């Protein structure tokens, strides 16, 4: 009876060691937080129902009470958006998988009682079996789960940075819509004054019905453009509200109604490809996916022939006293020799490797494309600001003088006004495009491919 006692002692020790494993649902968040702060200069907090949450709420209210800048809007969104809080829970899921990978499977305890049909004493059989091969396979499973946990941390970090970039884009789009609305309001006011003057001239017989109708048509077109600008502003405000996690009185925030001018000096673009590759969370995540796929292949090969090996004890009582003996259980690999599992793991490893190389090419191409796009948008905005806008203003002033001197007709005057309006609209659009391109370029250099640039960490099923 000595060996069953020793076996029982080993089982008890394993049960004790397994019971020591625990799950920290916030595991890995400190690393994510540090990486986000280093890459974006913004802070994130995982709500825990503590005093820290109240401090965060107070900070959010304080920021929303003032006039928001783009940086402040991003900070509010990172602190206040509930979707981000849900994303952080992915860390707890991955940590739970890592803990689970380090646990032994529970022993199987079986009891069988048979009653002789002729009467007499019942037969009793007790069996306890445990898969001790788990002791060999646990390190392999843990390495796979650890790589996936690292990938999850990178994916969550990338999701936070992407969300910050989306919030910044929403801010600039809304700010451009504010400026566009202000422009359209100014245009309608000016056109209304022009129509009123034209009305008096028409009543006095100094301009024809056709010229007066053209003035009115231009005003009505301006009013229609104003309504479109109001609708666009309402939509962009709600987009920003969603990003900020704002509702109720919190939606009464204000921002500057004009886009900032093109910054001087411009954003540094030297070695952008190198920086994008070195900082890429997408590539780092794919490296972890390759590591996990390699570990999974090793695990599949190791368990191909003998995935289970049960060792246990059996006690049986029939007519006499209990008889006790060992049990050894293992599958005989006659049909399933793990070919499918090994082949799948090898294919997933090859896929992960090829995706990594494809992503590296995509990141380099995106860096060049965004650099050129940002430079083109900047040149376009500066060209409108420094050349076309002053030129259109000069043309409008000269046209007005010629019209007042009755040297040209109302058609030429209206055409000059339309050109001036369209140039101003184009300038706002060019300035908006510059800030959007700058946001995407900065996001790439912080380590995340902008939305629409291709497959990112976590998009491919494992």
What are these regions (language model features)?
Residues 97, 104, 111, 155, ...:
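Soluble, cytosolic/nucleoplasmic coiled-coil alpha-helices used as oligomeric scaffolds and tethers
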Residues 70-73, 80, 87, 131, ...:
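Amphipathic alpha-helical coiled-coil segments and their boundaries
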Residues 192, 221-248, 355, 359-363, ...:
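Short segments within alpha-helical structural elements
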Residues 2-76, 230-275, 442-462:
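Terminal intrinsically disordered/low-complexity segments used for targeting and assembly
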Residues 21, 138, 154-275, 373, ...:
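Periplasmic alpha-helical coiled-coil/stalk elements that build and connect Gram-negative outer-membrane
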Residues 21-44, 75-134, 237-246, 273-340, ...:
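A small-residue-enriched
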Residues 63, 73-80, 144, 151, ...:
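Amphipathic alpha-helical coiled-coil scaffold segments and their short linker/junction regions
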């Amino acid at each position: 009876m000595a060996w069953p006692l020793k076996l029982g002692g080993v089982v008890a020790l394993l049960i004790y060691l397994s019971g020591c494993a625990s799950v920290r649902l916030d595991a890995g968040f400190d690393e994510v937080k540090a990486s986000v702060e280093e890459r974006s200069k913004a802070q994130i907090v995982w709500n825990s129902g503590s005093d820290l949450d109240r401090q965060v709420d107070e900070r959010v209210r304080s920021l929303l009470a003032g006039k928001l800048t783009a940086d402040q809007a991003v900070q509010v969104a990172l602190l206040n958006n509930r979707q981000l809080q849900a994303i952080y829970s992915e860390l707890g899921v991955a940590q739970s998988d890592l803990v689970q990978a380090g646990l032994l499977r529970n022993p199987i305890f079986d009891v069988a009682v048979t009653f002789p049909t002729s009467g007499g004493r019942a037969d009793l059989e007790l069996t306890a079996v445990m898969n001790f091969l788990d002791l060999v396979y646990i390190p392999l499973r843990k390495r796979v789960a650890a790589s996936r946990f690292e990938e999850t941390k990178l994916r969550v970090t990338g999701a936070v940075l992407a969300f910050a970039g989306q919030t910044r884009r929403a801010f600039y789009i809304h700010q451009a819509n504010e400026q566009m609305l202000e422009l359209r309001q100014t245009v309608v006011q000016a056109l209304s004054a022009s129509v009123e003057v034209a009305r008096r001239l028409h009543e006095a017989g100094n301009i024809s019905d056709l010229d007066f109708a053209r003035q009115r048509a231009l005003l009505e077109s301006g009013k229609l453009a104003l309504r479109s600008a109001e609708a666009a502003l309402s939509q962009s405000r709600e987009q920003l509200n969603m990003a900020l996690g704002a509702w109720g009185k919190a939606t009464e925030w204000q921002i500057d109604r004009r886009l900032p001018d093109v910054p001087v000096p411009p954003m540094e673009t030297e070695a952008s490809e190198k920086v994008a590759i070195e900082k890429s969370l997408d590539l780092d995540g794919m490296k972890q996916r390759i590591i996990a796929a390699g570990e999974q292949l090793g695990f599949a090969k190791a368990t191909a022939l003998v995935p289970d090996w049960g060792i246990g004890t059996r006690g049986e009582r029939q007519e006499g006293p209990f008889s006790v003996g060992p049990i050894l259980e293992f599958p005989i690999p006659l049909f399933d020799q793990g070919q499918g599992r090994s082949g799948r793991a090898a294919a997933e490893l090859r896929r992960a490797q090829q995706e990594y190389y494809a992503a590296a090419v995509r990141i380099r191409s995106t860096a060049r494309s965004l650099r050129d796009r940002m430079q083109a948008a900047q040149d376009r905005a500066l060209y409108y600001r420094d050349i076309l806008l002053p030129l259109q203003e000069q043309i409008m002033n000269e046209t007005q003088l010629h019209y007042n001197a009755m040297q040209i007709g109302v058609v030429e005057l209206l055409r000059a006004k339309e050109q001036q309006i369209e140039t101003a609209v184009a300038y706002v659009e060019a300035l908006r495009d510059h800030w959007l391109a700058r946001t995407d370029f900065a996001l790439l250099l912080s380590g995340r491919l902008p939305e629409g640039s291709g497959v990112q960490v976590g998009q491919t099923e494992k």
